[in-house]
UniProtKB/Swiss-Prot annotation:
Gene name tied to this protein: SRB2
Coiled-coil portions: none
Residues passing through the membrane, by range: none
Descriptive protein name: Mediator of RNA polymerase II transcription subunit 20
Lineage: Eukaryota, Fungi, Dikarya, Ascomycota, Saccharomycotina
Alphabetical UniProt keywords: Activator, Nucleus, Transcription, Transcription regulation
Cellular component, GO, one term: mediator complex
Keyword field contains Nucleus: yes
Matching Pfam families: Med20
Keyword ATP-binding carried by entry: no
Chief location category: nucleus
Gene Ontology molecular function terms on file: transcription coactivator activity
Quaternary state and interactors: Component of the Mediator complex.
Gene3D superfamilies xref list: 3.30.310.180
Biological process (GO), any one: regulation of transcription by RNA polymerase II
Amino acid sequence: MVTILQYSADVTATTISTYRSELSAQLAQNLGKWSFELKMYKPNPASIGRSEHHNGNIPQGQQEAAAADQEIGGVAALYTLTQAHSKGDMVYVTQGSAVQGQPGVVVSDSFDMVLQNKMKSIWILRQTLRGDGAEYELMGDAYGRVKVRLANVFLQGTFRGLLFQYEYEGDTLDDRQQQHLMEFIQSSGFPSSNLIIGGNGSGLVQTGTQFVEALAQK
């Protein structure tokens, strides 16, 4: 599969209803509700303080300031992504100076519990973004078969924006398909700026890196 992501902050929480009505007008098949969850983990300040200073009396504020710019094993942040349509699978994405080539892997969604329970002395959950929306499918000679997902994005219950995801079957997206997608986006009045096409990895890993690029630090 190939995915394209788009995030817009210049909307309200009710904008999604307008776009869903437009999808219905385009005769898209409603596949039901869709949701996702993106979590960001950062190095535990206490762990960095112990490993670098061998001193348990470092003030908490200094530890947190150090953690903001520090890495553990060359990794500065871990992200986990779960999506409603890929139940049981979680994408694990890393960022940092040591991350080269494949930036992540697909793991069981139980890995999130391992991070929070077994590895909390090393990694701390810093941010959770949740998306709630719907999934549609477009079919036609112009588009091929493409799924359109859209969701309101929330950070700790506060609305932050609207995310679109376009998913194509196959391993590549040719120029013709990309052109038809842009025509569909423009004719539907959907946001067309800041489209994230491609990315590191492939399949779900590529999707995970797109989510991180679009939503990290939002």
